[in-house]
From Swiss-Prot:
Xref: PANTHER family: CHROMOSOME 12 OPEN READING FRAME 60
Name under which the protein is recorded: Uncharacterized protein C12orf60 homolog
Biased composition (Basic and acidic residues): 172-187
InterPro entries recorded: DUF4533 (IPR027895)
Annotated stretches, region: Disordered: 161-187
Length: 247
């Protein structure tokens, strides 16, 4: 087998491994985003669960559903804000504050007002930045890649502590057989990736599959960057509010 073919196989395996960890990062970031969204918008959207035996398509569909649900909530809050003139909002807030002062400690009243401002502000930022729509669109485009029918475990399997301990305690005869397992797993991964990613009648199917998966990974990295920036922005807004409430 040529060195170029071996190089393409290694590229494909490495791209699959990177994709595996990008999916884990994506789920982790989205759960953090959902946590911050729930905190600022006073909602109860459920976090995602990562099951490596599920189809990759299932992850993306769940992520898209989450963003659609958040977008509906933002649209609803923004529509509510649009109906009421700004001066009316201020008057309502001040009247409510005066009424509460008679029975509630002033700092509690201020916190309530700040929470309302935070929720309205978060809705406005999420609406005008189009971040939810952009993330939903990015994930929808990624779903067009042919890899969606595979399971996450088809791409890469992490060795658990139990597996590592079992390997280290293996007998000499078992150790002599052990290289066959990783090789078999690698060959199976290559076959599955090649089947779904290589165009029909491709002259170099492994190279074509590696090119396709590397492009997918690059596209995912852009989505991860958008999520990270959005999370940092939301964390900054919450930090400012916390500082104000602490004074």
């Amino acid at each position: 087998m040529s060195s170029e073919s071996e190089k393409d196989k290694e590229r494909l395996i490495q791209a699959a491994k990177l994709f595996f960890f990008h999916i884990r990062d994506l789920v982790s970031f989205i759960n953090r985003f959902v946590e911050l969204f729930n905190l600022t918008m006073k909602t109860q959207i459920l976090p995602m669960n990562l099951n490596e035996e599920s189809c990759i398509k299932d992850f993306f569909e769940q992520m898209i559903r989450n963003f659609k649900e958040m977008q509906l909530m933002v649209d609803g809050k923004h529509k509510q804000m649009q109906k009421e003139p700004l001066c009316s909002k201020v008057l309502t807030a001040m009247t409510s504050a005066v009424e509460k002062c008679a029975t509630i400690a002033p700092h509690h009243t201020a916190e309530d007002m700040l929470r309302n401002i935070q929720t309205s502000g978060a809705a406005l930022v999420l609406k005008t930045s189009h971040v939810l729509v952009n993330l939903e669109t990015s994930l929808s485009l990624l779903m067009q890649f042919p890899i969606m029918g595979l399971r996450l475990s088809d791409l890469y399997r992490e060795e658990t502590k139990e597996q590592s301990d079992a390997t280290s305690d293996a007998t000499t005869s078992e150790k002599n057989k052990s290289p066959e397992c990783p090789k078999a797993t690698t060959e199976e991964t290559l076959r599955k990736l090649q089947d779904v990613l290589s165009p029909e009648n491709a002259h170099t199917p492994v190279e074509a599959a590696a090119d396709e998966l590397e492009q997918f990974v690059k596209s995912m990295e852009i989505t991860l960057q958008v999520l990270q920036k959005s999370i940092k922005t939301m964390e900054g807004d919450i930090f400012v509010l916390t500082q104000v409430q602490g004074k």
